[in-house]
Amino acid sequence: MSTQVQEQVVIINAEGQILGRMASNVVRLLKEGKKVIIVNGEKAVISGEKNRVIESYKLLLTVKTLFNPYRNGIRRPRSPINIVKRTIRGMLPKSSKGRRMLKNVKIYVGVPKEFEGRQFIKFPDSDVSRLKGKYVTVEVVSKELGWSG
């Protein structure tokens, strides 16, 4: 029984992976019913010039609401874990099935001790070597947004 459960867990190394392409591959695995663990989530990259990428993320922080922002403001992701998870969430179905699939995703900053020495997967179609232009890591974006990690 435990060997069958172990086969359903996929561990992905996000270091040097393009965030959007990696997220679409993760969604494909989730639709197959697998549990996905992502390590080095802060080392995933977002394509584009650094200033443009950061400004586009900061633009989301300036959105105002007519409601009391202290009671129910618009929550925006700032930590690398939440940025990656939000990207994956945007690609999942907007239904109860999508919410169940999102619970099968775990994202870690760095590599936890329990996963050291394990085999990681990297998607060849989402490797950073595909990019000809500039890119920025998720860690840099989240530190610019105010993440204190």
Swiss-Prot record:
PROSITE patterns tied to this protein: RIBOSOMAL_L13 (PS00783)
Keyword Ribosomal protein: yes
Record keywords: Ribonucleoprotein, Ribosomal protein
InterPro entries: Ribosomal_uL13 (IPR005822), Ribosomal_uL13_bac-type (IPR005823), Ribosomal_uL13_CS (IPR023563), Ribosomal_uL13_euk/arc (IPR005755), Ribosomal_uL13_sf (IPR036899)
Domain of life: Archaea
GO MF annotations, alphabetized: mRNA binding; structural constituent of ribosome
GO CC field: cytosolic large ribosomal subunit; ribosome
GO biological process terms on file: negative regulation of translation; translation
Matches recorded under PANTHER family: LARGE RIBOSOMAL SUBUNIT PROTEIN UL13 (PTHR11545:SF3), RIBOSOMAL PROTEIN L13 (PTHR11545)
Family: Belongs to the universal ribosomal protein uL13 family.
Function: This protein is one of the early assembly proteins of the 50S ribosomal subunit, although it is not seen to bind rRNA by itself. It is important during the early stages of 50S assembly.
Subunit structure: Part of the 50S ribosomal subunit.
Name of this chain's protein: Large ribosomal subunit protein uL13
